[in-house]
A protein has these predicted regions:
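N-terminal periplasmic accessory domains that precede
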Residues: 54, 86-89, 129-132, 146, ...
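Short acidic/polar hinge/loop motifs at secondary-structure boundaries
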Residues: 86, 92, 120-148
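Short, acidic, small-residue-rich periplasmic hinge/interaction motif at the N-terminus
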Residues: 40-79, 99-101, 107-111, 147-149
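Extracytoplasmic beta-strand/coil segments of soluble accessory domains associated
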Residues: 87-121
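Outer membrane beta-barrel strand-and-loop segments of large Gram-negative receptors
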Residues: 361, 370-374, 413-415, 420-423, ...
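Conserved C-terminal beta-signal and adjacent last beta-strands/turns
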Residues: 616-744
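Surface-exposed extracellular loop regions of Gram-negative outer-membrane beta-barrel proteins
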Residues: 164-180, 219, 223, 237, 449-451, 481-526, 546-565, 682-696, ...
Length: 744
């Protein structure tokens, strides 16, 4: 039996592997023959031959790469990505966590933005990001970049990190390529999508469309809440059952035209929309400190019409000079959002009803539009120095209409609110490399003018002028080819969105909520150190960090009579220290183990209306085990959990949770067709999530549960030969803005 000798080497495809193996065999044979001839002094008229062992060149591609400003995960070469959704693949990416209810955090924070192909996309914004990423197959994605240190080039507002989803290949290939994917599960939810890339002469286009339907049966769940009101000693209890079904549509078209080797014109348009139907029914009661009934009523709510449409377009012109690396980019972006909500609340079986109405109809419309103009210029100086500079102007308009028609004697609500923002920004960034060292520093200035007005005369108009200087800096040392260390400092700001600003009052029998038109921007600062090891079989990252803010935008809650009142203010003081770690280990061929974990201590304080402080330790971990099996099968299992006391704002603790999944997939037709079957939490009927309110005018808990056990199948088929993909400008528009309300 011949013995195989394995040598690790880096190749790009099977063709290169075969060519290298052939050359190594020839070279080894020649060297062996020469050596044997030199040792044989008696026979010089012949060459002694020896049969060589087969030399197999294998390739272990590193899926994670660390740069001075970002960490990149190679989705395209992750074998498990062919039959996963983008939401599932996020669990495997360093610094990213997805909890049991599919809420996404980056570096432990929900303050992040999602880009597509290097620029903000209207389809990846809003409050339903998890549904969008669930509908998008990972097979359409090349890589995902976690920009942990957004420098001066990125907007100062709205983000401490950026997820950049790169969906097309930037290499010069040629031809036609496409992909079709289908998915379904046992609850009746299903999805379908396709994309196609073509090239005609110098024109390259990419078109994609995805649709996802979630059945009401999958989202069936319930909740209960019990609270104790400290001052009065009264107690309340509420319970409800609910279900939600929705249909999501995501479309995108991109095109580029290479005028010549120095000039490139690219454009794209995208759209995202969904319709939702929600139904809920339950009961609510309140008792005094002696247990006597104060009031009781049953509640039913439904949403006969909820429509959300998000669309946008982008145009970039890129000019390169004959100096290598010098680039000028001119960009324009349009983003628009339309949202229409019609809902109905009904109350029945009432005893001592606390309000003078038995129901109401809510009709709200929100419109958002944004125009962005940007100029970017990059100029290298020698081999080790580079300057980046740019100018940006943003014009935003928000328009909100809210009408509440009460059934009873309560006064109807009719509010019209307009909000406009203008932002002018300039930045300068300097990058230097010297041997194993690299450093980047930058400064950004932003001027913003905000104006709010009430055409109905219900409130006085207001305006604000803000000036913000935002510095950033990073220093990286590459100890070896596989190890590096980085330290960075960054700042960011948050400006309030229309939901946070809109003063319209929305009431229920026991709650009242309204926005705060006087909100200003908040400032966040962060310091972190990152160690990266990228060895042949082991990838590891350790990142301790500390961040803080003194005027964060937060919700303010208090009790007024028997009503819980909530609004917003620039009053949050936050301190957080933590450790992020990622490990990916390939102990032997065909086996992969990975862990994405974090631990942190956080403290939040709110001084108004009374001093409230919330603090606690918490941790989360995602474990994944992948194993290649005979007959081209691949088995994958994952486990995720959250532990400790994760704080939820200044008043409450988040729920602890766990989640697990088993997947088997196989490729057919020369790896063009991939099919996966999976089981999500097969040994758990439903998962419970308990949120505990421990501070403020009332304490208690909110317990919710949903269905977690289901089975599904996914299939992805690739066709054609890709030889050229859409080229994109190396610089483009990024708007990292707004907390709360309708975004792009």
């Amino acid at each position: 039996m011949e013995k195989k000798a394995n040598f690790a080497a880096y190749t790009t495809n099977d063709k290169v592997r075969f060519t290298m193996r052939k050359k190594l065999l020839i070279l080894a044979a020649c060297l062996s023959a020469t050596a044997l001839t030199a040792q044989n002094t008696n026979r010089t008229d012949s060459v002694r031959t020896q049969k060589m062992d087969e030399v197999v060149v294998t390739h272990r591609r590193q899926l994670v790469r660390n740069d001075i400003d970002k960490l990149t995960y190679d989705v395209q070469h992750d074998e498990t990505a062919k039959t996963k959704s983008t939401l599932e693949i996020l669990k495997q990416i360093p610094f990213v966590s997805v909890d049991g209810q599919e809420n996404i955090k980056v570096q432990g924070s929900s303050s992040f933005k999602v880009y597509k192909n290097g620029h903000p996309d209207p389809g990846f914004s809003g409050q339903n990001l998890k549904e969008i990423l669930k509908a998008l197959p990972a097979s359409n994605i090349k890589k995902i970049e976690v920009i942990t240190d957004p420098g001066a080039r990125y907007d100062a507002e709205g983000t401490t990190a950026i997820l950049n989803i790169v969906m097309t290949n930037d290499t010069r290939l040629q031809g036609v390529s496409g992909n079709v994917n289908l998915s379904a599960n046992t609850w009746g939810s299903m999805g379908a999508g396709a994309y196609l890339t073509t090239k005609t002469g110098k024109l390259t286009t990419t078109v994609s469309y995805n649709e996802y339907y979630q059945s009401a049966k999958q989202s069936e769940g319930g909740s209960e809440a019990a609270y104790h009101y400290i001052e009065s000693g009264e107690r309340s209890f509420a319970s409800q059952n609910s279900s939600t079904k929705y249909n999501i549509h995501i479309g995108d078209i991109s095109a580029s035209y290479e005028i010549d080797s120095l000039n490139l014109l690219s454009a794209s348009a995208s759209g995202f929309g969904y319709a939702m139907d929600n139904n809920a029914h339950g009961t609510h009661e309140r008792r005094d400190k002696d247990g006597s009934l104060i009031y009781h009523y049953d509640r039913r709510s439904y949403t006969p019409e909820y429509a959300y449409l998000n669309f946008g377009g982008r145009l970039d012109y890129q000019h390169k000079t004959h100096l290598d690396g010098e680039v000028l980019t001119l960009s324009y972006m349009l983003a628009a959002t339309r949202r229409h909500n019609t809902s109905r609340e009904e109350y029945s079986n009432a005893v001592n009803m606390p309000v003078s109405y038995t129901g109401y109809d809510l009709n709200s419309r929100e419109h958002f539009s944004e125009h962005t103009f940007q100029v970017d210029y990059v100029r290298p100086f020698g081999k080790h120095h580079k300057l980046e500079s740019g100018l940006k102007y943003i014009l935003r308009h928000n328009n909100s209409l809210t009408f509440i028609d009460y059934t009873g004697t309560a006064t109807d609500v009719d509010t019209h609110f307009k909000h406009g923002t203008q932002v002018a920004a300039a930045y300068l960034s300097y990058l230097v490399t010297a041997g194993k060292w690299s450093a980047r520093t930058g400064l950004r200035y932003e001027y913003s003018y905000m104006k709010g007005e009430y055409p109905d005369g219900s409130n006085n108009s207001f305006h604000a002028r803000l000036n913000d200087w935002v510095p950033s800096m990073s220093l990286q040392y590459k100890m070896t080819d596989t190890q590096s260390m980085k330290i960075s400092y960054s700042t960011s700001i948050n400006r309030p969105g229309i939901t946070y600003l809109n003063p319209a009052v929305i009431s229920s029998p026991n709650t009242r909520q309204y926005g705060n038109a006087s909100l200003g921007s908040s400032r966040n600062q962060k310091l972190q150190i990152s160690y990266m090891l990228n060895a042949r079989k082991l990838t590891m990252n350790l990142t301790p960090y500390y961040d803080f803010t003194n005027n964060g935008i937060t919700d303010i809650r208090y009790v007024e009579g028997r009503t819980i009142v909530s609004t917003y203010g620039n009053v949050q003081k936050r301190r957080e220290a933590g450790l992020l770690t990622y490990t990916r280990w390939q102990p032997f061929r065909g086996t992969t183990l990975s862990m994405n974990a974090s631990a942190k201590y956080a403290r939040i304080a709110v001084p108004a209306p009374e001093v409230v402080e919330n603090k606690g330790w918490s941790g989360s971990v995602f474990l994944d085990y992948g194993q290649k099996l005979p007959w081209k099968l691949h088995f994958d299992t994952s486990l995720a959990l959250q532990c400790g006391h994760p704080i939820r704002g200044p008043y409450a603790y988040e729920a602890r949770w766990h989640n697990y999944r088993f997947t088997i997939n196989r490729s057919f037709l020369n790896d063009r067709l991939s099919v996966a079957v999976y089981a999500n939490m097969p040994f758990t009927t439903r998962e419970k999530y308990r949120y505990r309110t421990v501070h403020g005018d009332y304490t208690g808990y909110n317990l919710s549960w949903d269905k977690t056990r289901f089975f599904g199948i996914r299939a992805s088929w690739s066709f054609g030969k890709l030889k050229a993909s859409v080229k994109k400008a190396e610089r483009s528009i990024q708007n990292d803005d707004l907390v709360g309300g309708v975004k792009k």
